[in-house]
Swiss-Prot record:
Subunit structure, interactors included: Oligomer of 24 subunits. There are two types of subunits: L (light) chain and H (heavy) chain. The major chain can be light or heavy, depending on the species and tissue type. The functional molecule forms a roughly spherical shell with a diameter of 12 nm and contains a central cavity into which the insoluble mineral iron core is deposited. Interacts with NCOA4; NCOA4 promotes targeting of the iron-binding ferritin complex to autolysosomes following starvation or iron depletion.
Chain's gene name: FTH1
Pfam families on file: Ferritin
UniProt source species: Equus caballus (Horse)
Family: Belongs to the ferritin family.
PANTHER family assigned to the protein according to its UniProt record, in alphabetical order: FERRITIN (PTHR11431), FERRITIN HEAVY CHAIN (PTHR11431:SF37)
Name under which the protein is recorded: Ferritin heavy chain
Protein's job: Stores iron in a soluble, non-toxic, readily available form. Important for iron homeostasis. Has ferroxidase activity. Iron is taken up in the ferrous form and deposited as ferric hydroxides after oxidation. Also plays a role in delivery of iron to cells. Mediates iron uptake in capsule cells of the developing kidney. Delivery to lysosomes is mediated by the cargo receptor NCOA4 for autophagic degradation and release of iron.
Broadest EC class assigned to this enzyme: oxidoreductase
Amino acid sequence: MTTAFPSQVRQNYHQDSEAAINRQINLELHASYVYLSMSFYFDRDDVALKNFAKYFLHQSHEEREHAEKLMKLQNQRGGRIFLQDIKKPDQDDWENGLKAMECALHLEKNVNESLLELHKLATDKNDPHLCDFLETHYLNEQVKAIKELGDHVTNLRRMGAPESGMAEYLFDKHTLGECDES
């Protein structure tokens, strides 16, 4: 058994920020888990919307990378990583593309709200490094993700989803399929 030594690099890093980073890591991993569930739902033979599956798998990987980036920050700042149980997705059956996109939009808004609270904490604790880190790597990306998902929800509704299965098929093929090509 090794004894943990106090950090030699910790400077201007409040314990509340350290704890909040650990909570954010958990939330990012939860988001990754939800997107992974969505991806493999759309990959099922009775759903067969391969571009929805690819889209959500990409989102899952992105959320995991966000968690890893926060873990790296925690180590760089002299904090300690304390992983917690990852909450399972609220559902296993995502019903249709519109419902999944609506759930994803809600999820991203929750992640964004948590990041904004973390930024406020960093500001209150006079931690410009953490503020800059969040602004550089997370906040703008969240706004873009929320806008993209909002657009997807709008377009699916405009096309007649979920009542029209053809709408989902065309959205999968043309909208999400185009994302894959670029």
